Amino acid sequence: MKSFTTIFKRNKISFKENLFLIILSIFLSSEILFAQQAEPTFAWPEGKQIAISLSFDDARASQVDAGTALLDQYGVKGTFYVVPNSVRQRLEGWKKAVASGHEIGNHSFNHPCTGNFPWSRQKAIENYTLKKMRNELILANKDIKELLGVESEVFAYPCGQTYIGRGENTKSYVPVVSKLFLSGRGWLDEGPNAPQFCDLAQLTGMEMDGKDFEQILPLIENAKKSGAWLVLAGHEMGVSGNQTTRLSMLKKLIEYAQNPANGIWIAPVGTVAKYIKGQKG
């Protein structure tokens, strides 16, 4: 027969374990409650659950040769971050895109990126100054205005790189972008934008090039968990190829987004950015 002392010790241990679990449960419940109180659900227009923006870089010919026609078919407005010299190569197509209501953003004058890319060696951001970058962004805006008659309010960082200079002299040009534009978008980021928290000058941009809708859907579902803003970014628009957003994927994505049951607001970057800015006061 077990001794009274042994039974007492075991009951004492059991009591301590139960007490620990009760305290842990109360702590976790209070943490969850605090998180819910600290970060209320963001109110998207018309009760939507999330926002999605479709954005495309570089003013590539395929965007106006094939891409905008698909967007127009569904009444969807995209955001096109352009480089002036590329616009000149398809000027009439870009004028038509503007007339259709697509947003034209600034993607710099020379598309400077790190000199680690051989093609960018002569315009490496390591050799830029903040003054040079600012002047070129203003020059690009001026050219876009002259070519297309619109003011670019949004910007996308070439190659997603937000710095200039080297080593101890490296500087962020995010403050420059913040002063000149409503928003600045990155590239190859890993998550959507939290509307209550995001820095409009450093919006995340998630790649949609080379992906089927089945690969994009998890990004949408993840954004729904927190009521986020998913900014998708691409380049060429076509059937297939390098750095190409597939038209077949876009068709499925748009049809999914336009189904009221899915609770998605699909709008240009500038439109969503202005809404968020207005909500923040």
Per-segment meaning from a language model:
Residues 1-15:
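N-terminal secretory signal peptides that target proteins for export/translocation
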Residues 18-31:
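Bacterial N-terminal signal peptides
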Residues 38-46, 86-89, 181-197, 217, ...:
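C-terminal domain-boundary segment and adjacent tail
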Residues 66, 88-89, 115-216, 249:
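Catalytic domains of cell-wall/extracellular-matrix polysaccharide-remodeling enzymes
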